[in-house]
Amino acid sequence: MPRYGIAIDSTKCVGCHSCRVACQNQNGLESNETFNWIKNKNRGQYPSFDKEFIPLQCNQCENAPCQRVCPTGATYTSPEGVVLVNPKTCVGCKYCMEACPYRMRIIDHQRGIVEKCRFCIELVRDGGTPACVTTCPTQVRIFGDLDDPKSDISKFIAETGAQPLRPDLGTIPKIFYKRS
């Protein structure tokens, strides 16, 4: 079974939010809801001012704190290694939201449940890739099997030295970043 991950080359991100819109469309989210965020980071001072855009999403942690604190087992890891939420057993207690050190979950107030990025698992199981990956005009994201040394994602990580956010937390994220 593959161990899926995403590598993000934030040096290519132009902050267009195509990933966010594709995610919203794929997941039926409202315009004020998203599983993808773009953090804007200012660098330098005028006149040598620059802006870095950092795409953020659930890190699909192998040691997921959100999963450990879920009292109903609604947060679980799929056979593909994707951290998911079962909407039928989620009671909306928000323990998982508090436990996530990356703050990458949202509450669906209408349904009273917590939601998060699912790596578009329905597309992946049909041989596709997540919507945020396919829609990006600058190919910021690379999706693939982290355990396959010949995969594009593994090659990218090896060649660029891409790292997860906050490896010191011990969550073992499956999202890797190349930053400037």
Model-found features: residue ranges?
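Non-ligating segments of multi-cofactor redox enzymes
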Residues: 1-180
